[in-house]
C-alpha cells in the first residue's frame, strides 16, 4: 500500500482542479491530485483538446489544450503530486481536520482537507458492445490514443461520429497505411469543418467513410483481423484491419461520490458559497460538481470558487480566524512562494 501525506487532497485534474493547486500554493499549502483519467486536463484534454474556448479572461481565443498547458505551467511552481489513472473510492474523516483518501489502487493520502473538483464525475469511455471483443483491448482495440506512432503504416478502423472520431481520423490518415471511419449514419455530432475535410479526403482517396454498425468481428491466431459492418438496409460488409479505435465518447459517472454522505442536489454537491465547503466540514467542492442557487457551469466560475475555497481551507489548516488577502503584485511572501524576486524600488521605477 502506497501512503502519501499532504495538506490538501484534490480530486480532479481538470482546469478548476489545476487552478485549485495554484490558489492553495499561494497560501503555502501542499497538494496531492487524484484523477481517474491518465492525463491532466479533464474534459478539455479528453474530449475537445483542439476546440477553441472564448470565455477565459485574458485569453480571447485559445484551444482547450492551450488553456490546460497554461494552467499546468502556473500550478507546476508548487510541485503538486499527481495520482493519474486512479479513482478515489473512499474518504474517511479521522478527526475534525484529518482525512484519509483511498483510491481503487489502495493508495492512501493523509490530508487535512479535501477538495472535490471532479467536474461531472469520473469519466470512462463508452465501449463497443460486442461479446468477447474486450480481449483485444490495449493491444489492437483502443478507446483513446496516447501514442500515435503505434498506428503508423497500419490499417486503422475508427468508430464514432463525434469530434474525437473525426479529429483523430483526420490526424491518423497522415501516417497510417489506411483509415476507415465508420459511423451509424451520415449525421455527425462534430464540427462542420471537420466533416467537410473528411469528405474531401475521401474524394482524394486518402481515407474512407462507411455508414453502418459493427455486428461481429473476425480473428485469426488470437489477433483481431476484421469487422462485419451491417448497413441500415441489412447488407453486411467485411472490412479488414490491423488496429481498431473506438471513439463513442466518454460517460461521466459520479461513482463513489454518491456514497460519501454529502448533501446532494440532482447529482451535484451542495456547497456554502462563502467557503465552498460541503455538508461535511473539511470537504470542499468546486467547479461543475457543485451546486448552489444561481450556479453556472463555467470554467471561470470554477476559478472564482477555487480562490475562495483556498482562503477558507488555509484558515482551517493554518488555524487562523482570517487569512489576509496577499496580492501577487506586491506581497514578498507570495513572491517567495512563487519563486520570484521583486523589490518595491523596482516596481516603482
UniProtKB/Swiss-Prot annotation:
Keyword field contains NADP: yes
Domain of life of the organism encoding this protein: Bacteria
Binding site for FAD: 35, 43, 48, 88, 123, 288, 329
InterPro entries the UniProt entry points to: FAD/NAD-bd_sf, FAD/NAD-binding_dom, Fd--NADP_Rdtase_type_2, Ferredoxin-NADP_redctase_2
Keyword NADP: yes
Catalytic activity: 2 reduced [2Fe-2S]-[ferredoxin] + NADP(+) + H(+) = 2 oxidized [2Fe-2S]-[ferredoxin] + NADPH
Sorted UniProt keywords: FAD, Flavoprotein, NADP, Oxidoreductase
One example GO MF annotation: flavin adenine dinucleotide binding
Cofactor note (record): Binds 1 FAD per subunit.
EC number: 1.18.1.2
PANTHER family documented for this protein: THIOREDOXIN REDUCTASE 1-RELATED-RELATED
Protein family per UniProt: Belongs to the ferredoxin--NADP reductase type 2 family.
Stated name of the protein: Ferredoxin--NADP reductase
Organism this protein belongs to: Colwellia psychrerythraea (strain 34H / ATCC BAA-681) (Vibrio psychroerythus)
Amino acid at each position: 500500500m502506497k501512503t502519501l501525506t499532504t495538506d490538501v487532497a484534490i480530486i480532479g485534474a481538470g482546469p478548476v482542479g489545476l487552478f485549485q493547486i495554484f490558489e492553495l500554493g499561494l497560501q503555502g499549502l501542499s497538494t496531492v491530485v487524484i484523477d481517474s483519467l491518465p492525463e491532466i486536463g479533464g474534459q478539455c484534454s479528453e474530449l475537445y483538446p483542439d476546440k477553441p474556448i472564448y470565455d477565459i479572461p485574458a485569453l480571447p481565443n485559445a484551444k482547450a489544450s492551450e488553456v490546460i498547458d497554461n494552467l499546468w505551467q502556473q500550478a507546476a511552481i508548487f510541485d503538486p503530486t499527481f495520482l493519474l489513472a486512479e479513482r478515489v473510492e473512499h474518504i474517511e474523516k479521522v478527526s475534525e481536520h484529518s482525512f484519509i483518501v483511498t483510491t481503487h489502487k489502495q493508495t492512501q493520502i493523509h490530508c487535512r482537507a479535501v477538495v472535490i473538483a471532479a467536474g461531472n464525475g469520473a469519466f470512462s469511455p463508452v465501449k463497443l458492445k460486442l461479446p468477447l471483443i474486450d480481449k483485444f483491448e490495449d493491444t489492437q482495440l483502443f478507446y483513446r490514443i496516447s501514442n500515435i506512432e503505434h498506428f503508423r503504416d497500419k490499417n486503422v478502423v475508427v468508430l464514432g461520429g463525434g469530434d474525437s472520431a473525426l479529429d483523430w481520423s483526420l490526424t491518423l490518415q497522415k501516417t497510417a497505411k489506411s483509415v476507415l471511419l465508420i459511423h451509424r449514419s451520415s449525421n455527425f455530432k462534430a464540427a462542420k469543418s471537420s466533416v467537410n475535410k473528411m469528405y474531401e479526403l475521401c474524394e482524394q482517396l486518402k481515407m474512407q467513410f462507411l455508414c453502418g454498425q459493427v455486428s461481429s468481428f473476425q480473428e485469426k491466431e488470437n489477433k483481431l483481423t476484421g469487422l462485419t459492418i451491417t448497413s441500415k438496409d441489412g447488407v453486411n460488409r467485411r472490412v479488414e484491419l490491423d488496429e481498431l479505435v473506438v471513439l463513442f465518447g466518454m460517460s461521466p459517472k459520479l461513482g463513489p461520490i454518491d456514497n460519501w454522505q454529502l448533501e446532494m442536489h440532482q447529482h451535484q454537491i451542495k456547497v456554502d458559497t462563502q467557503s465552498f465547503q460541503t455538508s461535511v466540514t473539511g470537504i470542499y467542492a468546486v467547479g461543475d460538481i457543485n451546486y448552489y442557487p444561481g450556479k453556472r457551469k463555467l470554467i471561470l466560475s470554477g476559478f472564482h470558487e477555487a480562490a475562495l475555497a483556498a482562503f477558507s481551507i488555509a484558515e482551517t489548516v493554518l488555524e487562523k480566524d482570517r487569512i489576509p488577502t496577499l496580492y501577487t503584485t506586491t506581497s514578498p511572501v507570495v513572491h517567495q512562494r512563487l519563486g520570484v524576486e521583486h523589490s518595491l524600488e523596482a516596481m516603482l521605477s
